[in-house]
């Protein structure tokens, strides 16, 4: 069963210092204005979940069906809608229009962060898969950065699916697991997560409690 999480915006990276003077690299996430737009139950939808809106959007950019959906909940239109599967007991504590804040997490807690990685365009195998390049000289005239053989002979006579070749790199959903929350700024509604997370500055991310915590029995 999934847990309730937060939708956020990647502000950027910085570092903080511990009381002992150690430097910790952190990613700053803005998780303000997470508001509940719908509570789904087994009776009405066949499963239990909560739908959350994040950010803001001009009324002229909202479709009529979505505008009606948000008006029913009494919630301002958001930049993004995200659904989290939760148990019935947790859903009973929430209501439409309720704000989900940084108090959902605590310092030291492990979380999973999902985002969209930075797109790199069409890339070769050296950049995309860390292949080694060919020899610069000594008989190598036109095969410095080629991937090499991509198959066998007449049998099987084809390239196997999944062969690592050149192609589009980045711009895909990536989840980084077991990141630690180093600090919480409740006043500015910021989460400072230890380490790097996918995506560019301003990118949308989803933060949820870790599901595979290291060392857990």
Swiss-Prot record:
<protein>
    <recommendedName>
        <fullName>Large ribosomal subunit protein uL3</fullName>
    </recommendedName>
</protein>
<feature type="compositionally biased region" description="Polar residues">
    <location>
        <begin position="134"/>
        <end position="146"/>
    </location>
</feature>
<feature type="region of interest" description="Disordered">
    <location>
        <begin position="134"/>
        <end position="154"/>
    </location>
</feature>
<feature type="modified residue" description="N5-methylglutamine">
    <location>
        <position position="154"/>
    </location>
</feature>
<dbReference type="GO" id="GO:0003735">
    <property type="term" value="F:structural constituent of ribosome"/>
</dbReference>
<dbReference type="GO" id="GO:0022625">
    <property type="term" value="C:cytosolic large ribosomal subunit"/>
</dbReference>
<keyword id="KW-0699">rRNA-binding</keyword>
<comment type="function">
    <text>One of the primary rRNA binding proteins, it binds directly near the 3'-end of the 23S rRNA, where it nucleates assembly of the 50S subunit.</text>
</comment>
<dbReference type="InterPro" id="IPR009000">
    <property type="entry name" value="Transl_B-barrel_sf"/>
</dbReference>
<dbReference type="GO" id="GO:0019843">
    <property type="term" value="F:rRNA binding"/>
</dbReference>
<dbReference type="InterPro" id="IPR000597">
    <property type="entry name" value="Ribosomal_uL3"/>
</dbReference>
<comment type="similarity">
    <text>Belongs to the universal ribosomal protein uL3 family.</text>
</comment>
<keyword id="KW-0488">Methylation</keyword>
<dbReference type="InterPro" id="IPR019926">
    <property type="entry name" value="Ribosomal_uL3_CS"/>
</dbReference>
<dbReference type="GO" id="GO:0006412">
    <property type="term" value="P:translation"/>
</dbReference>
<keyword id="KW-0694">RNA-binding</keyword>
<dbReference type="Pfam" id="PF00297">
    <property type="entry name" value="Ribosomal_L3"/>
</dbReference>
<comment type="subunit">
    <text>Part of the 50S ribosomal subunit. Forms a cluster with proteins L14 and L19.</text>
</comment>
<dbReference type="InterPro" id="IPR019927">
    <property type="entry name" value="Ribosomal_uL3_bac/org-type"/>
</dbReference>
<keyword id="KW-0689">Ribosomal protein</keyword>
<keyword id="KW-0687">Ribonucleoprotein</keyword>
């Amino acid at each position: 069963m999934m847990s309730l999480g937060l939708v956020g915006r990647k502000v950027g990276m910085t570092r903080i210092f511990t009381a002992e003077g150690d430097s910790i690299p952190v990613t700053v996430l803005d998780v303000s204005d997470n508001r509940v737009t719908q509570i789904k139950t087994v009776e009405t939808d066949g499963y239990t979940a909560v739908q959350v809106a994040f950010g803001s959007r001009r009324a002229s950019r909202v479709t009529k069906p979505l505008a009606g959906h948000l008006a029913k909940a009494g919630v301002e239109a958001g930049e993004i809608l995200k659904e989290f599967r939760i148990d019935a007991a947790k859903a009973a504590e929430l209501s439409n229009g309720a704000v989900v804040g940084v108090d959902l997490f605590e310092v030291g807690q492990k979380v999973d962060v999902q985002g969209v990685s930075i797109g790199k365009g069409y890339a070769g195998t050296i950049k995309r898969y860390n292949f080694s390049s060919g020899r610069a000289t000594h008989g190598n005239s036109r095969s410095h950065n080629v991937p090499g053989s991509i198959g066998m002979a007449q049998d099987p006579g084809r390239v196997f699916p999944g062969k690592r070749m050149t192609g589009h790199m980045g711009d895909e959903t990536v989840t980084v697991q077991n990141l630690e929350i180093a600090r919480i700024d409740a006043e500015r509604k910021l989460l400072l997560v230890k380490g790097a997370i996918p995506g560019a500055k301003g990118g949308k991310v989803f933060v949820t409690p870790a599901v595979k915590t290291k060392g857990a029995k």
